Amino acid sequence: MSGLKEDFNLNGNELNYFNACYTAAYVVFQVPGMLLMSRPQLARWLLPTLEVLWGVVTFAQSRVTDVHQLYALRFLVGMFEAPVFAGTHFILGSWYSGAELYRRAGTWFICNPLGSMISGYLQAAAYKNLSGAGGMAGWRWLFIIDGIFTIPVALLGYVVFPGIPDSPRPFYLTEDDTKLAKSRLEKFRIRRPGRLGLDVFKRTLSRWHIWVFVFCYM
């Protein structure tokens, strides 16, 4: 990030530690996060809560005074973001059949790079025009702007996010809607979301094609 390296006199691997802290937390907390996501009582509230916390930590990064604070906050960002990717598709898969799911999952995947592309231009403009405003460096303003975008959307999630069919019913769904959703699971032979125990992850790790995807990502 422009200006951050110079402000903290970062050298060598110090820049790599930003990603290392984030990735370490992402790896460690993804499985525990998904275990929580599989609980119907938590499924509706967990993702919005994680996004609110992500936004708060993003704001906090704008106020760091040394690089070690930034490392700690990057670790927290990775922790809060860890179950979001898999959790989103877990939630989608609990409501839609295969024929319906690929459109929604595809839209989600398309929006990710589009969002990154647009945010890149916005961040460049913000850095150029806000650098020095309020006595703060441009890179600090980028964290503030990211937080401003994130927190209102995350708070909206408490109202509109449905969780899984067995979660507490949101206001916009009737009892009949919930019954229909559950009957669709049986009609399309969609396995009803259950708790993700450690035995599930053990079975997953024993399947060869999972490791093929791991090496593809590497």
Region spans (language model):
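Conserved MFS/SLC helix-loop-helix module at the cytosolic interface between two early adjacent transmembrane helices
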Residues: 28-71
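Hydrophobic core of transmembrane alpha-helices in multi-pass small-molecule transporters
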Residues: 57-58, 69-83, 91, 218
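Extracellular/periplasmic helix-loop-helix junction of adjacent transmembrane segments
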Residues: 1-29
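Pair of pore-lining "gating" transmembrane helices in MFS-fold secondary transporters
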Residues: 75, 202, 206-218
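Membrane-interface helix termini in secondary transporters
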Residues: 3, 34-39, 121, 125
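Short hydrophobic/alpha-helical segments at membrane-entry points of transmembrane helices
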Residues: 66-74, 86, 137-138, 211-213
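Small-residue-rich segments within alpha-helical transmembrane domains of MFS-like 12-TM solute carriers
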Residues: 62, 66, 78-86, 95, ...
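Central mid-sequence intracellular linker of multi-pass
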Residues: 97-114, 121, 127-201
